[in-house]
Amino acid sequence: MINSIIKTIDLGDGRTITLETGKLAKQADGAIVLRMNNTMILATVCVAKDTNPCVDFLPLQVEYKEKFSAFGRFPGGFTKREGRASDYEILTCRLIDRTLRPLFPRDYHSEVFVNIILFSSDGEDIPDALAGLAASAALSVSTIPFNGPISEVRVARIDGKFKINPTFGELAKADMDIMVGATADNIMMVEGEMNEVSEEEMLEAIKAAHEAIKPQCKAQIELARIVGTTIKNTYSHEVNDEELRSDIKTKLYDKVYAVAKSGQCKNKRIEAFQTIIEEYKKQFKEKELSEEKIFLIKRYYYEIEKEVMRRCILDENIRIDGRKTTEIRPIWSEVNPITGPHGSAIFTRGETQALATVTLGTKLNEKIIDDVLINDKERFLLHYNFPPFATGEARAQRGIGRREIGHGNLAHRALKPIIPNNYPYVIRVVSDILESNGSSSMATVCAGTLSLMDAGVQIKRPVSGIAMGLIFEKEGSKYAILSDILGDEDHLGDMDFKVAGTKKGITATQMDIKIDGLSYEVLERALSQAKQGREYILDKMLETIPEPRTDLKPHTPKIEIIIIPKEFIGSVIGPGGKIIQRLQEETGTTITIEEIEKMGRIEIFGDNKKSIDAALTRIKGIVSVPEVGEIYEGKIRSIMPYGAFIEFLPGKEGLLHISEISWKHLESIEEAGLNEGDFIKIKLVDIDSKTGKFKLSHKILLPHSEKYTAIRREQHEKI
């Protein structure tokens, strides 16, 4: 017998969300079916029974999958089944993971698998925020230790008003699109893109999202109470040796403090820290250094590193590289360091370095997005690569990971608002991280801006980005906001807050908070300090190239755009694409055509102006209307016994009958001396009103003396 429990959440705008448990996937540790309108999501959570004692992190894995059948579609490809995760699915996984992960107990190390599947959709409601709610609800109805619940909502600003969880259609009209993940009390995660908005406007949006999240969290608590899972499983995943912990702190604290205050570069600091721990291990005999003991030494040593770094910042305002809290690392940049791409730039900030290149292409280079709910074409692409050598790792690079997709997406969202509207080229920016010690995604934003300017793309305004950090004293009220954080400050700190924008406002942001109880006052201060930092970085960038180049690079493909009446689109394409293919072959150009707003938009790409002009002339000929009485120079396309077919305008052919070639009577077409490919002047003498066929004449253009001679000759021959 099915004993399902349902909880309904009223969104306050006529929409409701239902959470149901006890009906589907009952063998999972927790399972929730979420429904809103025609959207149905199943979220399950399972935990491994055994735990590895030598693991000091949470092995959490979040998977989000959209079924093509959810929208009544067949998957593509030969197998006709879902394949690897799309970028959208990966980004959704990351949004959920980043909100859930900080809320598991720090000493909980069991493998946890969260699986979310979209089983039904009407194509209107956006499922990613609902997936976060479903995942949290599945954890809430399980006995897995979890300090939630959380929920996620999307907040969009449309015509000056905030809309929670807008539809795809509504989101297209928004100038602000932010995903927020939070508990009832605290913001945990923020990510979004904006059209150059102020810090105050962004904070208002976050507050609006948080208010919408609170009742969703309350509903999950009530659901857990009904199910009976408010009391979570007890666990003991860490074995501790307090005597060893005390010994390490007593002997190593001052040494670690000295290294932390020395302000060394990353590699030297790592070597110095490693030397300290290796020296400490020498006091033990080899047989005493079991795997478990080495593991504990590393863990306790890490605790000291974290405490020392935090105390240096909070007590002395000194960071591990010697900077003050608001200080930005040294910056240098260069444009056009490599000449092959259509634009390139290097941006270096401290020990983080990005090389960005720009390639300008045709409409044929558009990225086709064929996801379950999103069918679109992308004209601005940004790809982010993070090779192992960027951090000095000796390993092979095995494809693109989730992290690279996530970082690339953030940089893409930061730059997209400043790309010119209706820009004729498809743009691809590639960022290769050559060195990394904190905030390589924001270095990508800066390098990407410089490379676009070097390529001659007339961006609306240049963008810079910065990563902010936070050190918060739990026992007191002291905190420090850090500008331009290092990798260690990200790892050991309490917040990673990336902000990108122009002088006018913010274009993208991403925030992950690792602690509870962060006030809006602290967020406001962090945003204000971030603004100062990114404006400083932007000024440094503009010293290298103050504005976009006025001209494209010489080897950039040339482009010409022509708008034609809709009814001529078929004439330009021709039957089976015959006309447009011939145009491209004969002129050496690439031609694309599409219908936009009941007009035909033709883009002609070529390596030089001469080839583009040739194609343009031919197209203008195709779309021009032939007029009776006009004289044209046509090309002989084919010769028949009864005459020749002449193309007198591109795509327009007519018959030059044998009787219209010469005033002289021709017994056969061969007497005319015509050859395929020859050019001949003709006059359009008539257009058949029924068939639309063109009647051509060449003899009518011949001198009258030839006509008189031909007539006399014919009369003489009759005598």
From Swiss-Prot:
Its cofactor is Mg(2+). GO terms for cellular component: cytosol. Residues 629-699 form the S1 motif domain. SUPFAM superfamilies: Eukaryotic type KH-domain (KH-domain type I), Nucleic acid-binding proteins, Ribonuclease PH domain 2-like, Ribosomal protein S5 domain 2-like. Mg(2+) binds at D490, D496. Residues 557-619 form the KH domain. Belongs to the polyribonucleotide nucleotidyltransferase family. This is Polyribonucleotide nucleotidyltransferase.
